């Protein structure tokens, strides 16, 4: 690795750093060496995380080397090198004036980010460096605990108290192993993230939570989320000593909000009422136990849990405190307009004093609350919700966080802290009240509307000052979007002598930024409150987005100021048919409000962008939402970003109003040069920082490029542009004519695509960083799990290790068809029918501890894990099947799933949601009229979707088949092939047939065609240990001479190699290198797991976009194993709407042969040798390979059709995506 010397420190960097990276590392060293704070902004994609890690760890090593050199020189006492000065030994600490005399004085590095998933990314970067420090990651019990009983607790605070109870009683064997095993090399040495820590703890049966706390003592660098540092209670809980440490806040644009929220609270009537209910329960139990003269079983000495060490009088006093607090809050008079009242921060002490909560009593109250919560931890029941009591305990700690000696309301420190707070009391909008309590202790406020007590901190500097008071050596805040840096430093209220606004590492031809003040019709674009919902503005914005989507290739991101604005805009565009036109250009994916469905939505977007022949996709998101931060939209996933307005906070929100008033007051008190922003400046910056976060999605690395559209006339003002990041400002251009925007953007992308290298194909998609995303979305290969995508040999077949005896042909692709004819273990039973498949897919959940990639939207109903296959290669037996209807049901299930795949590919996200809801309603109500009314608008308007409507016929309930036929003819002009017997339920059709005597006719055991029957010699071959195929060739003209079901599998011989090579050559020409790679990966996966669903999903996405690719789908049958042939042919027919060539299903000429029971007993008979059997079998297979069905000719064949490469996915005349 290159070694760079900066400020006298040698830094090992994984590659030669760019100039901006060297400047960044120099500023970091300046903070560390001079013991000062720094604010460092460096755009996303410039490698700031790597620079931070390498620089800080190199500086620590430099200090350690200096101490070592000084100690050696002192011991030598100048005898060895009398002429050399002491400073020449690298006494860096002495030279810098640092009083670091021993190794334990070397500062620890505390690296904080917003979420653990972001920290995992940082740890992965650390593994890529040459540094191997002692590492520790701090997490909560919710993330780290492996005790089954503790993990069952629903809330975090219950886990905490139950854990403490078990630790105190030494009843947790995981905790008991911590001291013994914490020094083991496997646990102490490697760089472990949260997942690794849990896996190692489970393996060694040691508690990961307490193990991480042990490792913290000796760690060189400690990783933790923000709140562990900013929240005083969390600092105490994790015993974090900040004295002399270097604290780094990565993604620091969130620090301001986190500082304020960690020191604020909202106490609702529901919190107090639930707390009182819990205390009532404990008081009642203790009273009954006292009246009976013996302890309650829950509190007895024999109970494994320690009893409640509280007197009845103390519990009653605690209840009285809560009632008085509730009464004091309800006694505050509010104005009639429900606007609430605001008091100064010191009012909180007056209010709490009425309930006898003071600095003097807080200790006893907190102990009592803690005892009750810990006593009830682990107990089940509706009356043991201790969340209210826990919240009250946290609130008391926030209010009385300052020591009594310096925190009294009259002291200077207390006054300074209270200036940052406001008390706001307002009506409870949620009306979350418990039932009225009827005892004498019950509050009278329950009959009135409750009030919420809010205690809000408006200065992030309050938390920053607390960190400085703890003795932090240096505080470094860094992010990609801190602009304007000067105002950010003012908000923190502590000095930052070192500041940096780094440029980007990209060139000017890689970024295009334009302000679009007017739409194509000349109407002004504005998201101002009075214009955002006007018809003129919404219509013009919709037309502008549609035109931009035509010229931006691949992925396009559109950010709205808020969810209501996005939803209202979509509603307007759907009503005016603008949304349908956008869908025709690029399908729309909308960011959901809920956390659970976000991963699926973003995975669907990634998959659509990566699909071969796709024109891309559009993702509609919200500023400050999940997609605006932490997601990687690099390369084709995000070639353009559109910001539709300035996302100002809600202007009339009480918290926003009070924040602006507070800032104006502070600025006024400090005079014209006061170190505070004005309220209006802060308000504007909230919008600009959200915009900057959205802009940061487009350029993610050195070779990336993209365009930014600022679609609001207010961006044309100089003050708005001044708030943009420094690396963006030089590229901004304001356009007066919308046509010039389209012209310049089209030219930009033409030049970029010619000059920039094509992005490398990825095995996995960008990771979803952040806690909102439970699992990581993968693309462009959404059809495989993360575990398989990481295996190199899946994507490079030539690297796969061959077992001895496997073919080692020169062409690695020729080995793909080997062993396809072997039978796997049958799959477990699956749900039957379309509705059952839909319901089954919604109920499925991933297995814990296994990496899973969420399927894209087109595959959410597809893949299901099969049982592991048993060893193959054993002798195969003829099995007598007594229930021939089961394979039919399995095929029907496969058709249902694949039909859902096709529908989800063709419909938009909103329309697919409507479709699935209609299915659920039809399943529950059996209302065919409602179903038909829903399906008509979805499938009838577009002729390309008529085949989907007709394909739905097979899943309509029998008594509705005829009606559906009539609806189909009415909507599409074509029927579905209805016959009267289709109206008879399957069960009735499958009833046993009675012979003339009234007895049940014998059930046929085996079905074979006439041609197949001619190949069998029952007297010589069947069950006699001899060849199953007759040595005589099939007669000319016999149907058996053509490939039948299960006969098209090529072997690894020359003919098989040529067939495979020809097929893959045609696939590469038609689908491109990326599509062919996907096909190869799917084929390899099919060979390993025998999951036809997965390979069909990939195949459908690749070969059904264009009719000329249909032959590739049909010719794929050469790789399909025999037991999948019938399902594959039916699927081909369903997907293409054409009969499967050369694979006609069994017709009337088939005759059923009942195998006599005597044939199930084997008798050893002399037979031909193994070589003879092999030769005869191979000759038969070769005859099948020689005679190909029409339409499946290999490379160069006429039936395959010419291979055509897809055109560019953009341009003014871009074609509609899909079929």
Curated annotation (Swiss-Prot):
Residues 863-873 have a biased composition (Basic and acidic residues). CDD domains: DEAHc_FancJ, HN_RTEL1, SF2_C_XPD. GO terms for cellular component: chromosome, telomeric region; nuclear membrane; nuclear speck; nucleoplasm; nucleus. It is an enzyme of class 5 (isomerase). Coiled coil: none annotated. Changing residue 964 to L: In DKCB5; severe form consistent with Hoyeraal-Hreidarsson syndrome. Residues 287-306, 757-786, 839-877, 979-1005, 1017-1054, 1132-1151, 1159-1219 are annotated as: Disordered. Gene3D superfamilies: 1.20.1160.20, P-loop containing nucleotide triphosphate hydrolases. It is found in: Nucleus. The keyword Metal-binding applies. It holds the Pfam family DEAD_2. A motif (Nuclear localization signal) lies at residues 151-167, 871-877. It catalyses: ATP + H2O = ADP + phosphate + H(+). Residues 757-766, 1200-1219 have a biased composition (Low complexity). PROSITE patterns: HELICASE_ATP_BIND_2. A motif (PIP-box) lies at residues 1178-1185. Changing residue 492 to I: In DKCB5; severe form consistent with Hoyeraal-Hreidarsson syndrome. Its EC number is 5.6.2.-. Its main location: nucleus. It is linked to Dyskeratosis congenita, autosomal recessive, 5: A form of dyskeratosis congenita, a rare multisystem disorder caused by defective telomere maintenance. It is characterized by progressive bone marrow failure, and the clinical triad of reticulated skin hyperpigmentation, nail dystrophy, and mucosal leukoplakia. Common but variable features include premature graying, aplastic anemia, low platelets, osteoporosis, pulmonary fibrosis, and liver fibrosis among others. Early mortality is often associated with bone marrow failure, infections, fatal pulmonary complications, or malignancy. Dyskeratosis congenita, autosomal dominant, 4: A rare multisystem disorder caused by defective telomere maintenance. It is characterized by progressive bone marrow failure, and the clinical triad of reticulated skin hyperpigmentation, nail dystrophy, and mucosal leukoplakia. Common but variable features include premature graying, aplastic anemia, low platelets, osteoporosis, pulmonary fibrosis, and liver fibrosis among others. Early mortality is often associated with bone marrow failure, infections, fatal pulmonary complications, or malignancy. Interacts with TERF1. Interacts (via PIP-box) with PCNA; the interaction is direct and essential for suppressing telomere fragility. Interacts with MMS19; the interaction mediates the association of RTEL1 with the cytosolic iron-sulfur protein assembly (CIA) complex. Amplified in gastric tumors. Belongs to the helicase family. RAD3/XPD subfamily. The PIP-box (PCNA interacting peptide) motif mediates the interaction with PCNA and localization to replication foci. NCBIfam families: rad3. This is Regulator of telomere elongation helicase 1. It comes from Homo sapiens (Human).
């Amino acid at each position: 690795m290159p070694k760079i010397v900066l400020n006298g420190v040698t830094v090992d960097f994984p590659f030669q750093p760019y100039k901006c990276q060297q400047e960044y590392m120099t500023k970091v060293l300046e903070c560390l060496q001079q013991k000062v704070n720094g604010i460092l902004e460096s755009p996303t994609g410039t490698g700031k995380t790597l620079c931070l890690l390498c620089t800080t760890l190199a500086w620590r090593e430099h200090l350690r080397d200096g101490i070592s050199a000084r100690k050696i020189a002192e011991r030598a006492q100048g005898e060895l090198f009398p002429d050399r000065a002491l400073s020449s030994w690298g006494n860096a600490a002495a030279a810098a004036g640092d009083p670091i005399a021993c190794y334990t004085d070397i500062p620890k590095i505390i690296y904080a980010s917003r979420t653990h998933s972001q920290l995992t990314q940082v740890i992965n970067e650390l593994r890529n460096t040459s540094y191997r420090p002692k590492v520790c990651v701090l997490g909560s019990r919710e993330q780290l605990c492996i005790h089954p009983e503790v993990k069952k607790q629903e809330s975090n605070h219950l886990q905490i108290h139950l854990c403490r109870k078990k630790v105190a009683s030494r009843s947790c064997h995981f905790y008991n192993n911590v001291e013994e095993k914490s020094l083991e090399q496997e646990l102490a040495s490697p760089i472990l993230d949260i997942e690794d820590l849990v896996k190692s703890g489970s393996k060694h049966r040691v508690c990961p939570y307490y193990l991480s706390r042990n490792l913290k003592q000796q760690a060189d660098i400690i990783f933790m989320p923000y709140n562990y540092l900013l929240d005083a209670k969390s600092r105490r809980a994790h015993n974090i000593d900040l004295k002399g440490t270097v604290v780094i806040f990565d993604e620091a644009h969130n620090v301001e909000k986190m500082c304020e929220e960690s020191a604020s609270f909202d106490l609702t009537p529901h919190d107090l009422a639930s707390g009182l209910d819990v205390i009532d329960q404990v008081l009642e139990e203790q009273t009954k136990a006292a009246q009976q003269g013996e302890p309650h079983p829950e509190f007895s000495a024999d109970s494994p849990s320690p009893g409640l060490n509280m007197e009845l009088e103390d519990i009653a006093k605690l209840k009285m405190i809560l009632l008085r607090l509730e009464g004091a809050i309800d006694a505050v008079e509010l104005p009639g307009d429900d606007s609430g009242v605001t008091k100064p921060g010191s009012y909180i002490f007056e209010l709490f004093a009425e309930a006898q909560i003071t600095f003097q009593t807080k200790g006893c109250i907190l102990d009592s609350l803690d005892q009750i919560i810990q006593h009830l931890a682990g107990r089940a029941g509706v009356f043991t919700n201790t969340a209210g009591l826990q919240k009250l305990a946290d609130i008391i700690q926030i209010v009385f966080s300052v020591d009594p000696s310096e925190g009294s309301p009259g002291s200077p420190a207390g006054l300074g802290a209270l200036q940052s707070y406001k008390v706001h009391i307002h009506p409870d909008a949620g009306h979350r009240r418990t039932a009225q309590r009827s005892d004498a202790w019950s509050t009278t406020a329950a009959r009135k509307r409750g009030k919420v007590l809010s205690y809000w901190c408006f200065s992030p500097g309050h938390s920053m000052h607390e960190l400085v008071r703890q003795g932090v050596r240096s505080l470094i805040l860094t992010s990609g979007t801190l602009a304007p840096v000067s105002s950010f430093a003012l908000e923190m209220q502590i000095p930052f002598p070192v500041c940096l606004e780094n440029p980007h590492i990209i060139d000017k031809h890689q970024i295009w930024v334009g302000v679009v003040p007017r739409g194509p019709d000349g109407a002004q674009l504005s998201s101002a409150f009075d214009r955002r919902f006007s018809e003129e503005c919404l219509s013009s914005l919709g037309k502008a987005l549609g035109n931009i989507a035509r010229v931006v290739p691949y992925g396009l991101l559109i950010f709205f100021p808020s969810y209501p604005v996005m939803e209202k805009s979509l509603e307007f565009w759907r009503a005016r048919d603008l949304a349908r036109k956008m869908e025709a250009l690029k399908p729309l994916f909308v960011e959901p409000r809920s956390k659970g469905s976000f991963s699926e939505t973003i995975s669907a977007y990634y998959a659509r962008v990566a699909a071969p022949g796709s024109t891309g996709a559009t993702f509609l998101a919200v500023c400050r939402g999940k997609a605006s931060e932490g997601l990687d939209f690099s390369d084709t996933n995000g070639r353009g970003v559109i910001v539709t307005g300035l996302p100002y906070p809600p202007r009339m929100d009480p918290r926003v109003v009070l924040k602006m008033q507070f800032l104006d007051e502070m600025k006024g008190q400090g005079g014209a040069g006061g170190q505070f922003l004005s309220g209006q400046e802060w308000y504007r910056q909230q919008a600009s920082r959200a915009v900057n976060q959205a802009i940061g999605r487009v350029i993610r690395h050195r070779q990336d490029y993209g365009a930014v559209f600022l679609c609001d006339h207010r961006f044309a003002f100089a003050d708005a542009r001044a708030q943009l990041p420094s690396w963006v400002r030089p590229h901004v251009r304001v356009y007066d004519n919308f046509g010039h925007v389209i012209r310049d953007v089209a030219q930009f992308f033409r030049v970029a695509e010619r000059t920039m290298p094509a992005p490398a194909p990825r095995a996995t998609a960008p990771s979803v960083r952040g806690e909102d995303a439970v699992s990581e979305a993968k693309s462009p290969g959404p059809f495989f799990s993360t575990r398989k995508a990481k295996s190199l040999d899946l994507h490079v077949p030539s690297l796969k290790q061959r077992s001895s005896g496997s073919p080692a042909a020169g062409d690695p692709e020729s080995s793909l068809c080997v062993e396809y004819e072997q039978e796997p273990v049958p799959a477990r039973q699956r749900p039957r029918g379309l509705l059952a498949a839909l319901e089954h897919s919604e109920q499925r959940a991933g297995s814990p501890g296994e990496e899973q990639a969420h399927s894209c939207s087109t595959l959410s109903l597809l893949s299901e894990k099969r049982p592991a296959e048993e060893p193959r290669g054993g002798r195969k037996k003829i099995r007598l099947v007594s229930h021939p209807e089961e394979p039919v049901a399995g095929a029907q299930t496969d058709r249902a799933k694949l039909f859902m795949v096709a529908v989800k590919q063709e419909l938009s996200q909103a329309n697919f949601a409507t479709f699935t809801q209609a299915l659920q309603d039809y399943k529950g109500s059996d209302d065919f009229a409602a179903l038909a009314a829903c399906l008509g608008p979805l499938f009838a308007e577009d002729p390309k979707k008529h085949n989907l409507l007709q394909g739905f016929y097979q899943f309509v309930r029998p008594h509705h088949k005829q009606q559906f036929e009539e609806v189909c003819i009415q909507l599409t002009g074509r029927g579905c092939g209805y016959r009267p017997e289709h109206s008879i339920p399957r069960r009735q059709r499958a009833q046993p047939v009675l012979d003339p005597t009234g007895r049940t006719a014998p059930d046929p055991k085996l079905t074979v065609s006439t041609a197949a029957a001619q190949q069998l010699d029952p007297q010589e071959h069947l069950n006699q240990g001899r060849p199953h195929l007759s040595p005589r060739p099939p007669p000319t003209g016999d149907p058996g001479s053509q490939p039948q079901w299960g006969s098209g599998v090529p072997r690894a011989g020359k003919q098989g190699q040529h067939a495979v090579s020809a097929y893959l050559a045609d696939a590469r020409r038609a689908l491109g290198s990326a599509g062919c790679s996907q096909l190869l990966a799917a084929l390899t996966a099919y060979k390993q797991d025998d999951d036809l669903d997965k390979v069909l999903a990939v195949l459908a996405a690749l070969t059904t976009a264009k009719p000329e690719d249909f032959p590739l789908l049909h010719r794929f049958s050469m790789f399909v194993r025999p037991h999948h042939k019938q399902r594959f042919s039916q699927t081909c027919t369903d997907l293409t709407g054409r009969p499967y060539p050369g694979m006609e299903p069994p017709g009337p000429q088939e005759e059923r042969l009942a195998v006599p029971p005597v044939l199930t007993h084997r008798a050893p008979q002399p037979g031909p040798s193994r070589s003879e059997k092999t030769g005869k079998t191979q000759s038969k297979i070769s005859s099948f390979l020689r005679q190909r069905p029409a339409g499946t000719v290999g490379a160069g064949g006429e039936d395959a059709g010419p291979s055509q490469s897809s055109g560019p996915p953009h341009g003014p005349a871009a074609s509609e995506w899909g079929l």
